[in-house]
């Protein structure tokens, strides 16, 4: 099973290649059509423009060999895998509805904790362009997500009463460059069960060709207010879980900052094929800049397909 998961980026790429063989490539005519979606922090880091698409994403994350707890450095190792299908529907260039988090999680540590799998919490919301200037290739958008606590507790979902996640995102194009960033908060409705966090993500990419975009991304999560959940992991962990998991840690402020950097690319497989506008494949390799023991990530491989319509 682990081998199959590791091969998923190749499977997605092979599927894209098949679609590419039947694709029709024409010049993009819509404003901002040449810009790409970020790859990492898939739950909270979205593009600023309002566009319609289906997004299939797989994130395979190696867990640290040891994690920081009130009992000392506890062995963990193993991996976490998230597979999700996300969607956005744009009513116009100013407004869209978003299904941002709905997927399946495999949590398979080698030590201390049990292997488990289950459904992630569902998050949905909307996005509105506060400033929209195609001639300057500049957008500023506001987004509001609501997460519902219906997921599987076995994989650290379903705790609390959900949360609200407001954010502001900008996009700026310059020649062949794309710059993008977001700043937001995760505000739990039950402060005892989930931590409040502030996050920021940044993206820079360059159109090496009209189809190929090397990229760099940076993500930062900061615990603004720790929770007080009594579950075993939450009661001893000295950190929070990052973008996918909110542990509700009683000691999240001990190591409140979690920062990662990622390098990767997007490849535009086709443009304008029938009712579809374009299909993009993305891949990124991500590493923590903070101590890996103070989180749940030793490294992460993210691969996705984005089908615009």
Regions found by a protein language model. Name each.
Residues 1-36:
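Cleavable N-terminal export/targeting peptides
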């Amino acid at each position: 099973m682990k081998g199959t998961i590791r091969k998923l980026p190749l499977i997605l790429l092979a599927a894209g290649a098949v679609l590419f063989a039947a694709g029709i490539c024409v010049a993009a005519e819509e404003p901002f059509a040449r810009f790409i979606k970020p790859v990492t922090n898939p739950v909270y880091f979205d593009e600023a423009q309002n566009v319609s698409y289906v997004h299939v994403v797989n994130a395979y994350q190696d867990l640290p060999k040891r994690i920081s707890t009130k009992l000392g450095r506890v062995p963990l190792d193993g991996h976490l895998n998230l597979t999700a299908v996300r969607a956005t529907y744009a009513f116009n260039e100013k407004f869209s509805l978003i299904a941002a988090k709905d997927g399946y999680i495999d949590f398979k540590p080698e030590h201390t904790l049990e292997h488990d799998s289950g459904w992630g919490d569902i998050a949905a919301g909307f996005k509105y362009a506060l400033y929209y200037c195609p001639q300057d290739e500049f957008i500023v958008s506001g987004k509001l997500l609501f997460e519902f606590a219906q997921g599987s507790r076995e994989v650290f979902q379903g705790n609390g009463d959900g949360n609200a996640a407001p954010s502001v995102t900008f996009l700026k194009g310059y020649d062949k460059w794309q710059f993008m960033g977001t700043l937001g908060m995760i505000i739990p409705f039950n402060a005892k069960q989930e931590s409040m966090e502030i996050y920021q993500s940044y993206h820079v990419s360059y159109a090496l060709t009209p189809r190929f975009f090397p990229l760099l991304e940076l993500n930062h999560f900061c615990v603004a207010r720790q929770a007080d959940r009594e579950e075993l992991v939450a009661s001893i962990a000295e950190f929070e879980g990052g973008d996918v998991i909110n542990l509700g840690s009683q000691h999240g402020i001990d190591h409140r900052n979690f920062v990662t950097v990622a390098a990767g690319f997007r490849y535009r497989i086709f443009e304008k094929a029938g009712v579809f506008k374009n299909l993009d494949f993305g891949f990124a390799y991500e590493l923590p800049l903070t101590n890996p023991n103070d989180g749940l990530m030793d490294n992460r491989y993210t691969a996705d397909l984005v089908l615009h319509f």
